[in-house]
Amino acid sequence: MLYYILRYINELYSLPGMGVIEYLTFRASAAAITALLIIIFAGQRFIRFLKSKFVEPIKEEAPPEHRKKKDVPTMGGLMIIFAIEVSAFLWAKIDDPHVWLIMLAVFWMGLIGFIDDYQKVVLKVKGGLAGHYKLIGQVTLGLVIGFYTWNDPVFSVLLSDTTVPFFKKLSVDYGIFYIPVVIFIITAVSNAVNLTDGLDGLAAGNAAIVTFALGVFAYLCGNAVYSGYLSIPFISGAGEVAVVSMAIVMACVGFLWFNSSPAEVFMGDTGSLSLGSAIAVIALMIKQELLLPVLAGVFFVETLSVSMQVAWFKISKKLYGEGRRIFLMAPLHHHFQLKGWAEQKIVIRFWIISILLFLTSLMTLKLR
């Protein structure tokens, strides 16, 4: 909204320096700063409110170290969502479909996560929202995103094609499977971030790194010169994705101000599902979803560890009459906790891995 107001003022009065509002880098930086300041200045008061109403009980099967977190409030994802939506509304071109589709994804999956958290914390429903209802929410979002991008002329330029990392001129056409692929990616990534949200700062830090990388890709895809030089598809309007991406990055960083160990607040499913859906939608819009197993490798491995644990437990029960485990506990971060690793060490090492994967993803721009 500020973009349109300042642009209108500039057209009327031609004030010196006002033309900077047209620069993506300026608006991306402004959105990032706005998101960060919203959380830092409103965070403490909001945490006090959450603590009076929304303290989630610690699961019995959780590692012993988690017992000391019994009084930490959840639903901190509401702060993240508010900061993202306000920052994007102020600094991005909100009439651009890239922008409002990301904002829709953040809001919708945040709502699903909120219902889940509310049932667990307030209504004391064990396990929260039933898994099939979450799945319905994810599929609904996937259908909306899929059908809209398939039919809207802004997106239909590339139709259902997507790029393949490490290959210069190779692309994949999903064809009639485009919408199922969209649904799968949104569901998989939102669940992956949700599974990773188990240690102080783990999900927020990794989400910030992954989204920053996607923001860089969005900026390059939205620039005809850079995209041509790097042999990646030029996507008109993708630059606005970079503005929203930076808002998400700094909303996560601002949240880390309170969520780093020892955490004062947890994001809950409210935050993890919304961040995961945002990452998925951004990747889909800039045709980098096939890069996610590399870029979002930490989320991918965390999810894989759960799948392997469950599968082997069921298989071994049939083979040996008792369920056996590959890991001490899944997701993987809990395995390392039970092996004696300090929580902060696990989180920082996972951040380092995400940074390495981010750099590897950037290398794919030239390794083609």
Swiss-Prot record:
| Recorded GO CC terms | plasma membrane
Name the top EC class: transferase
GO biological-process terms attached to the record: cell division; cell wall organization; peptidoglycan biosynthetic process; regulation of cell shape
- In which pathway does this enzyme or protein participate? Cell wall biogenesis; peptidoglycan biosynthesis
Record-linked InterPro entries:
Glycosyl_transferase_4, PNAcMuramoyl-5peptid_Trfase, PNAcMuramoyl-5peptid_Trfase_CS
Q: Which cofactor does it need?
A: Mg(2+)
Q: Which Pfam families match?
A: Glycos_transf_4 (PF00953)
Its main subcellular localisation, reduced to a broad class, is membrane
- What parts of the sequence cross the membrane? 23-43, 72-92, 98-118, 139-159, 170-190, 201-221, 238-258, 281-301, 345-365
Q: Which keywords does UniProt give here?
A: Cell cycle, Cell division, Cell inner membrane, Cell membrane, Cell shape, Cell wall biogenesis/degradation, Magnesium, Membrane, Metal-binding, Peptidoglycan synthesis, Transferase, Transmembrane, Transmembrane helix
Q: Which PROSITE patterns does this entry report, sorted A to Z? A: MRAY_1, MRAY_2
Q: Member of which family? A: Belongs to the glycosyltransferase 4 family. MraY subfamily.
Q: What does this protein do?
A: Catalyzes the initial step of the lipid cycle reactions in the biosynthesis of the cell wall peptidoglycan: transfers peptidoglycan precursor phospho-MurNAc-pentapeptide from UDP-MurNAc-pentapeptide onto the lipid carrier undecaprenyl phosphate, yielding undecaprenyl-pyrophosphoryl-MurNAc-pentapeptide, known as lipid I.
HAMAP family reported for this sequence: MraY
This protein is called Phospho-N-acetylmuramoyl-pentapeptide-transferase
Its source organism is: Chlorobaculum tepidum (strain ATCC 49652 / DSM 12025 / NBRC 103806 / TLS) (Chlorobium tepidum)
> By which gene is this protein encoded?
mraY
